[in-house]
Every structure is written in C-alpha cells, then in structure tokens.
Amino acid sequence: MMPSTLSLCLMLAGLCSLVTSHLTEEIQASNDTENEYSSTRRISPYMTDFSIDFYRLLVSKSNTTNIFFSPISIYTAFTLLALGAKSATRDQILTGLRFNRTEISEEHIFEGFQQLLNTFNLPENELQLTTSNGLFIDKNLKLVAKFLEDSKRLYASDTFSTNFEDNMAAKKQINDYVEKETQGKIVDLIQNLDSNVVFVLVNCIFFKGKWEKPFMTELTTECPFHVDSKTTVPVQTMRRLGMFNVFYDQDLSCWVLKMKYMGNATALFILPDTGKIEKVENALNKMLFHKWTRNLKRRAISLYFPKVSISGNYDLKILRELGITDVFGSNADLSGITEETNLKLSQAVHKAVVNIDEKGTEASGATFAEGIPMSIPPTVEFLRPFIFIILEENTKSVLFMGKVMNPTGN
C-alpha cells in the first residue's frame, strides 16, 4: 500500500578530473559546426545565466569556502523533471532555470537537451565526457507511459525497479549506480532516504580532461597559497614558462587565463588581485565572458598553478530562492510522472568533485618546445583565491563552475 504522501528524491553527481596543459588560439567555429549544434546553442545562454545566478546564491551562503558544481547536471535533472511537471510547477522549474519563455519554446528546450546529451556521449569524442540519468522506481508505482518514453528518447534514461521498503538495499542500488557512472570517484552519494520515497532520479556527469601540453612534473614545488590576509596553506604548485592566452582586465583588476583541453573543452581561470574577488563576482555575466574571450592574447608568462582537490555538496532546496518552490511542497503537480496526485520532491542533492593534478596524463614521453620572447615575461601566480568555469566548446555549454578558496579542500 502506498503512503499518503509520496516523495521523489533527486540525486546529482559530477566528477571533473583534469590533467595539466597550456592554451591554444581560439578557432572560429565553421558554419557547419554552427548548424550542427544550433539546437544546443539556442539553450546555452540561459544555462550561462543560471550558472552565474546559482554561483552567486552559493557565495551568498558563504564567501569563505570552496565552491564547485556542475550546472549541466542540475539543468539536466530539473529539465527531465519538468517533462513530467504540469501547470505552475513546470513554469517555475523552467523559469527558475532562467529560460525566457517568450524567446524559446518548450519544444526547443527539450530538443536542445537531446542534442546536448547526444554530443557528450559520442564514443569518438576525445574528451572523456559522459552523462547518465537513472530512474529508480518503486516496484508498486506506475509511471505515466509518455514520461517514460520521453525520458528515454530525450535523455537516454536508465530505468530500475526498486524496493524502497528495504531502505538499505535501495540506497545500495542507487549508490552503486552512481559509483559505476563516476568510475568510482563518487561513493555513498545517498546517506539517507526519506521513508516515503517511491521515486529517485539520479543524474551523473563524468569528465576527465587532458590538457594539450603538460607541465613538467619535476618542476612542481611546494608554495604558500594565500587563503586570506592571515592564512596560508602549503600546496603543490605546477610551474611552466610558455605561451598562454591571457588578458589582464584593468577595470576589474584580474587576470584571465584560458586553458585548452584535448577535444572540445576549455577552461577560464579568473585570478582577481588581492581583495578584489567580490568585485569580480558582482560583475559576472555573459557579456563579461564575451569581453574576456575577445581580449585574450597569446603571450609569454611564467605560470604558477596549484594542484587542486575540492568538492561541493549541496541541498538543492536552495533553488527555492531562484523561484523553484512548488515542486518541493504540497502544491507540486508532477501528474505527468505518475497518476498519483500526491508526489513531491522531498530530497534533491548535488555532489561534484574536481581534481587538478598531473595524474593520468598520456603525454609522457612526448616532446614539446616553443619559442619564448627574450624580454622577461610577467609572472602569474594562482596562489590566492580564484574562480573558474569549464565549457564544452561545440555546444557552448557550462560543464562546471567553481571557486578555489583553499586548493587542499580544507
């Protein structure tokens, strides 16, 4: 017998593993590429808006801690949820994800995500970039056939029958799925399940990026990272003298460094001058990213970059502050998921892990040389708090975003 109130649980896991590199000049996408990814590029500006708003929301909770999350993971899970939401619940989800409904139709939103996920999971992709969606359904719960069909067609979702009456077995089944999909990097995502849960939706994203040109491991040395004016922590720091795409923003007092991965992903690392990080955070928007990208110049610098190991673990009920409210309470209308009228989202958890180090590089044994101007290059030391954003270039999608306040994760 079903309980009087049914709960849906949303779990999101993201892993980003990076190995060191340098930057190459940005290449303009061809018309063919523009057309090939047109559906996804239609939704990417809204995803960028959401990424920045969610970042600011996390900063408002604590401006002294590391931040790391996967906007694409959150986006994928909640648009999948929107497939089965109706009326105000659906409107709130799509508006909270920053879609402007006067500019883009629901058809184009879901079409864009279908193309996006297909692009990520291509076997010939040089990047190790995969996403997965798991639907864990109580063995006694009957889902609406259209929701199952659409989630499979648009999101390639896996469906599992689950006995939620056996709480421990259900947790193990779901955690084993997450561990497998993140290649063992995220374990025990679910610590507890509400007793009345009958449906769990899990999204996983796994990304391992290899930089085009590696740092030399023998140059890595310990340096002090300045957490704040009173605190430093020792951190293993990679060093490289070379040609990089960089820009110093005089208006915001920050360095911008673009790093290119093998394949179609890039990262922007933003290093504010001491005491200027809040100024930069307040200025973040799409136009600022465009300004930085336009002004990047290839030049010689002496780069110091710390090894990073941080994670983020977030209760996504904070999305209420972005206007997504009904789905979490008694007003939820998820009648497109199940014919039961009392289904609500009781738990929504997102965990993401990032490691930036020298492990796993396949560039060992390769030789690389480049010309450096005779003049003394500037030194750029990422040895104080910095912001970063990782994008998939073809689709212009934000994969990960974060802030490093302490690269050791403490």
UniProtKB/Swiss-Prot annotation:
Gene Ontology annotations for the cellular component aspect, listed alphabetically: extracellular space
Example of a GO biological process term: acute-phase response
Post-translational modification Phosphoserine, affected residues: S375
Cell compartment(s), UniProt: Secreted
Principal localisation: secreted
UniProt tissue specificity: Plasma.
SUPFAM superfamilies (UniProt xref): Serpins
Protein's name according to its UniProt entry: Alpha-1-antiproteinase
Lineage of source species: Eukaryota, Metazoa, Chordata, Craniata, Vertebrata
